[in-house]
């Protein structure tokens, strides 16, 4: 169904799960959470496990979305959390926490400026939430890779330029060559 689901068979769980868990457990569980590109619902499951009450997780792939929906219903008996929906769309969301991790839509852009504008659009369509958890392909990853072209590889300066006047924290979640690519997780907080 999804090649990344093999991570359940590895000896160690992905580092981003641990970091996302530790960050999210500090937030108010009544926060409105919008997750973009939830895949099979790994982060959605963390949110539900931690007791968040207002979670909307979007997945554009219908088959993967259905699998994530079943998973959340089976694990937490929660319906309506995962939706098969493209984002951004003509639907406006209001979120306190926006989550975009382990999800890259490189095909929608051709330049770094277009990619940064797309990320900004995600943020605006979520009504400029106070907290934005975003994992990106790090610019330190320099290998040729058509799935992760150079224009979507970001560094801290790119993120700071996009979110001026915000507090920005970051964690390396994957590092090439130990992993297949380098990724950094950012927590962007409005001040």
Model-derived segments and their meaning:
Residues 27, 123-127:
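A generic alpha-to-beta junction signature in SAM-dependent methyltransferases
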Residues 96:
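Conserved acidic residues
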Residues 99:
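A conserved beta-strand element that flanks and buttresses the S-adenosyl-L-methionine
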Residues 107-121:
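A short, conserved alpha-helix within the catalytic core of class I
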Residues 45-48, 119-123:
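A structural alpha-helix within SAM-dependent methyltransferase catalytic domains
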Residues 102-103:
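Short catalytic micro-motifs in class I SAM-dependent methyltransferases
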Residues 1-28, 36, 40-52, 58-77, ...:
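Class I (Rossmann-like) S-adenosyl-L-methionine-dependent methyltransferase catalytic domain
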């Amino acid at each position: 169904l999804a090649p990344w689901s093999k991570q359940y068979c590895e000896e160690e769980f992905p580092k981003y799960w641990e970091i996302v868990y530790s960050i999210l457990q500090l937030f108010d569980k009544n926060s409105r959470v919008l997750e973009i590109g939830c895949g099979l619902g790994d982060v959605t499951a963390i949110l539900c496990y931690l007791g968040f009450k207002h979670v909307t997780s979007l997945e554009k792939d219908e088959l993967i979305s259905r699998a994530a929906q079943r998973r959340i219903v089976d694990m937490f008996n929660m319906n309506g959390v995962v939706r098969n929906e493209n984002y951004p769309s003509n639907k406006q969301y209001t979120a306190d926490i926006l989550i975009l991790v382990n999800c890259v839509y490189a095909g929608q852009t051709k330049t770094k400026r277009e990619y940064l504008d797309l990320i900004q659009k995600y943020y605006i369509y979520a009504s400029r939430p106070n907290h934005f958890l975003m994992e990106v392909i790090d610019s330190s990853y320099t290998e040729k890779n058509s799935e992760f072209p150079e224009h979507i590889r970001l560094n801290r300066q790119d993120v700071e330029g996009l979110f001026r006047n915000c507090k920005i924290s970051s964690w390396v979640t994957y590092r090439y060559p130990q992993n297949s690519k380098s990724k950094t997780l950012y927590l962007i907080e409005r001040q």
